[in-house]
Every structure is written in structure tokens, then in C-alpha cells.
Amino acid sequence: MIDEPASRTALVLFSGGQDSATCLAWALQRFARVETLGFDYGQRHAIELDCRDSLLAGMASLRPDWAKKLGETHTLAIPTLAEISDTALTRNVAIEVSESGLPNTFVPGRNLVFLTFAAALAYRRGVTDIVGGMCETDYSGYPDCRDETIRALRIALNLGMVRQFELHTPLMRLDKGATWSLAHELGGTGLVDLIREHSHTCYLGERGARHAWGYGCGECPACGLRAKGWREYLARIA
């Protein structure tokens, strides 16, 4: 008999960004205990990892019941990903669209690697629920964000590790406006303000420029999506 989520532990892929912060709140609402995992892979916006502490502290302060559920925070360094990737997320080059139609911010295999490492850690921790912020609605066309990719990987992980992992992607069908709305649904304006102020999305790692939707350069694709989502969210609650 499979235990209900309210009695299980989840491992959340937690970068410090808007999507992963929303997924963390989603998991805290559903599971008995929640651990987090971040990756240092040589990303230009590594400042996102520094945002995690503020987000964790903020969520614990916002909801005492969430504070009791927060477990260990893990960080894995995988510099090899940057060594084998020639992308604008790991090298100091201009962000542009490649001949394939994908932006050069695409890091080949990144989510596949992240979820495989997460599953290996979950295996050791006795955890079968893994939560990620992948989304195929409002995204840059990354093939490893697609639902069919995640479902196929789940099958491979379960076969390769002889486990029954569940890969939860609560944002898969949501655009960025709906992601802001989900944060409001989970934690009210307090959570929305926490994510707006303390999460990081900008590909260039800019934290000096403050906008209505948070910090960022305001020009990169990630900032554009976040800003567009914020405007849509405001229109929905008006």
C-alpha cells in the first residue's frame, strides 16, 4: 500500500529561482517533510544559489507549519556540465537564438542530469517523490522541459534504480502568470512578495536593478518571461 503524500518526504530541485521556490511551497503544502537540492554547475547566474537561504527562512517565517516540515538542504557541484557545454548560461557570451531555433541558453542534458542526480540522492535518502519546476507552457523551447521527456526519464530511473520514483512537475501546464497565481494560492501575498523580492531568475545574475517583478537585467529571456507573467498575474487579480 502506497502512503499518502501527507506522510511522505519529498526532494525538491531548488535553485533559488521563481519556479523552484513556487514548487517548494507546493511541496510543503502536500508532504510531511521536504528536503531541497541545488546544483552548482558553473552557471553565470550562480547568485541564484545564494537566494535559497532567504527563501527558506522566509517560508519558515511565513508558515510555522512549513517550518516544521523543512529538512536538509543539499548542494551538488557538477562543474563538468559547464566544461562540456558551450552555452550563454555557462560562458560569457551574448544571448541569442541558434540555428536550431533554440536560444543559446539551452544547456544540453541539464534537466536530465539534475533529475538523475536527484534520484540517486533520493535513493540514498529513502525518498521516492522528486519535485521539479519544469514547464512546457511558458519556456524557451528547451526539449528537456517537456512533459514527455520527464515521463520517459521517470521510466528509465525506475528501471535503472529499481525504485518507484514519482517526478512531480506542478508547473508543467502553467504559464508564468499562473505560476504567480499559484504562489498566491499557496501562501497569499506574503509568499508572492517573498518570491518577488528574494528569488532570482535573470540569466546574467543581475541583482542591482529592481523592477516591479523583482531583480534582474530586464532584457534577457528569463527576465522577459518573469515580467510578462507578473503583468498577467496583476491583470488576473485586478
Curated annotation (Swiss-Prot):
Keywords: ATP-binding, Ligase, Metal-binding, Nucleotide-binding, Queuosine biosynthesis, Zinc. Zn(2+) binds at residues 202, 217, 220, 223. One of its GO terms (biological process) is queuosine biosynthetic process. It catalyses: 7-carboxy-7-deazaguanine + NH4(+) + ATP = 7-cyano-7-deazaguanine + ADP + phosphate + H2O + H(+). GO terms for molecular function: ATP binding; ligase activity, forming carbon-nitrogen bonds; zinc ion binding. Binds 1 zinc ion per subunit. ATP binds at residues 14-24. Belongs to the QueC family. HAMAP family: QueC (MF_01633). This is 7-cyano-7-deazaguanine synthase. It comes from Nitrobacter winogradskyi (strain ATCC 25391 / DSM 10237 / CIP 104748 / NCIMB 11846 / Nb-255). The lineage of its organism: Bacteria, Pseudomonadati, Pseudomonadota, Alphaproteobacteria, Hyphomicrobiales. The gene is queC.
